[in-house]
């Protein structure tokens, strides 16, 4: 049985094996602690039998006005637990919090342009490629900014794709 619950400080010492995947972005401990302190509603872990960490999602809410949105900073599932709809459950949880609690207009995320399996999964979940960010990742790899409109964005303005790629310095952070 899988349990999804809020991430805790103790989990920081238990989730290293999930981060070993080469497609998973990893961060330093203070980065995780900042998210845990500032956006605890957006940080969840999935546990299996024996309290084994199966995956996690980490995000935040940010922006102003019609740019108010939920953001998926990281979502990852350990290879042995993939293809069990776990990432979908974690994504749905973050989307629900963004939509129902924080009344966001959309949820966004960044994904490596080469990570075809993740892109396909996000598209199945209703995300669209909003824009390409040139050289977003280390190694000069492009990133794709993917978005999904939430119920507050009745006209779906937040998911009208941009016509041209942008550079990282053109990104706006709130």
From Swiss-Prot:
Q: What InterPro entries would the database entry show?
A: Acyl_CoA_acyltransferase, GNAT_dom, NatB_acetyltransferase_subunit
**CDD domains reported in the protein's UniProt record:** NAT_SF
Superkingdom is: Eukaryota
Q: What class of enzyme is it?
A: transferase
**According to its UniProt entry, what is the function of this protein?**
Catalytic subunit of the NatB N-alpha-acetyltransferase complex. Involved in plant immunity through the regulation of SNC1 stability.
What family is reported? Belongs to the acetyltransferase family. ARD1 subfamily.
Designated name of the protein = N-terminal acetyltransferase B complex catalytic subunit NAA20
What gene is it encoded by?
NAA20
């Amino acid at each position: 049985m899988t349990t999804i619950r809020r991430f805790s400080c103790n989990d920081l010492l238990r989730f290293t094996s999930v981060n070993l995947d080469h497609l998973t972005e990893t961060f330093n401990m203070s980065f995780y602690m900042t998210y845990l302190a500032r956006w605890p509603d957006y940080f969840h872990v999935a546990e299996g039998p024996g309290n084994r960490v199966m995956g996690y999602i980490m995000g935040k809410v940010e922006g102003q006005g019609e740019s108010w949105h939920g953001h998926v900073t990281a979502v990852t599932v350990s290879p042995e637990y993939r293809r069990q709809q776990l990432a979908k459950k974690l994504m749905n949880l973050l989307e629900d919090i963004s939509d129902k609690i924080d009344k966001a207009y959309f949820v966004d995320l960044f994904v490596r342009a080469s990570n075809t399996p993740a892109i396909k999964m996000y598209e199945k979940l209703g995300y669209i490629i909003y824009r390409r960010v040139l050289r977003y990742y280390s190694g000069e790899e492009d990133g794709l900014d993917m978005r999904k409109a939430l119920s507050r964005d009745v006209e779906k303005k937040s998911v009208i794709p941009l016509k041209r790629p942008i550079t990282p310095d053109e990104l706006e952070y709130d």
